[in-house]
């Protein structure tokens, strides 16, 4: 197998670790089709620790724990500690439905930040999307608590329903003290796929794999959690460095339609909501409504 050398400009600096497919919610647009019946997959806690060590050796600067709901994995806090001990920042992408009191001390550690999804300023609309009654009140309360504690937080709002109160949700978040807010449309991937259609690469931002890499609960490596059908290897069989230097990785990047404007994409362009934060490749990708 030949080795492909990736330029330092596009080499992954962020690794998305989808540590579980389990989630208390079952959002109607979830790209990973996560839910209460999801599992932690084939990867063990030791496997995840090894991937984090590989990421550190490759000079990556951030690990994102995502799911599913990452806090449903029994080792999530240990994985946060592992990354921080190796000098890598951590983002925990949580639905903020259930936060145990003791978890706040983990989330408040230096080098850790939070991300979550929000859908409406009305409980009935928010809960219709998450399919879990009470999720609006619990997520809203935990957002307020994260802000109170000074934990860095970004929130993604996805437009799922016709006439959804996206603007009102943004204003409510701003009133709570949230300063980083992104909005996006639903991507037709995963649970939101159109009936009878296969995965469509034009639903991606066009820069998947450029600055980031994802590892799924199976150990499979893809350019992004959104492009999960573009499997380039498995960390249970090969090291991350070997996979990123392999032909399958290069072929996967080539299979993704390029951005319309040809400009570079921020390596932080990773899921900011259950259906991602990059605009589709057929549009000007990453042209987001993003309040700094």
Predicted segments, located by residue:
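Conserved alpha-helical substructure of the radical SAM core
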Residues: 1-105, 109-110
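Flexible mid-to-C-terminal extensions adjoining Fe-S/redox cofactors in radical SAM and related proteins
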Residues: 1-11, 225-292
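Radical SAM enzyme [4Fe-4S]-AdoMet core and its adjacent flexible, acidic
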Residues: 105-238, 242-243
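Residues within well-ordered alpha-helical secondary structure of globular protein domains
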Residues: 54-57, 82-85, 172-175, 227, ...
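Short, hydrophobic secondary-structure boundary micro-motifs
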Residues: 39, 155, 252-253
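Short cysteine clusters
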Residues: 23, 27-30, 205-208, 224, ...
């Amino acid at each position: 197998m030949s080795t492909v050398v990736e330029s330092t400009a596009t080499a992954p600096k962020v690794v998305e670790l989808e540590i579980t497919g389990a989630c208390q919610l079952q959002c109607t647009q979830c790209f990973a089709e996560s839910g209460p019946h999801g599992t932690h997959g084939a990867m063990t806690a030791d496997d995840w620790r090894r991937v984090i060590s590989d990421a550190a050796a490759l000079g990556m600067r951030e690990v994102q724990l995502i799911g599913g709901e990452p806090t449903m994995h029994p080792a999530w806090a240990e994985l946060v500690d592992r990354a921080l001990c190796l000098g890598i920042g951590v983002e925990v992408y949580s639905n903020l439905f259930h936060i145990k009191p003791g978890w706040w001390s983990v989330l408040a550690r230096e080098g850790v930040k939070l991300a979550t999804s929000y859908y409406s300023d009305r409980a009935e609309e928010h809960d219709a999307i998450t399919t879990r009654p009470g999720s609006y009140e619990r997520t809203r309360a935990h957002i307020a608590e994260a802000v109170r504690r000074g934990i860095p937080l970004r929130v993604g709002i996805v437009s799922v329903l016709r006439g959804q109160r996206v603007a009102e949700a943004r204003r409510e978040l701003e009133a709570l003290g949230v300063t980083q807010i992104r909005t996006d449309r639903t991507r037709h991937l995963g649970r939101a796929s159109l009936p009878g259609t296969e995965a469509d690469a034009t639903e991606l931002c066009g820069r998947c794999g450029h600055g980031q890499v994802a590892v799924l609960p199976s150990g499979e490596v893809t350019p992004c959690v959104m492009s999960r059908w573009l499997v380039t290897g498995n960390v249970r069989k090969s090291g991350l460095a070997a996979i990123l230097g392999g032909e399958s990785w290069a072929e996967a990047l080539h299979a993704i339609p390029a951005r319309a404007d040809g400009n570079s994409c921020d390596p932080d362009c990773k899921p900011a909501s259950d259906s991602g934060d990059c605009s589709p490749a057929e549009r000007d990708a990453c042209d987001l409504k993003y309040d700094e």
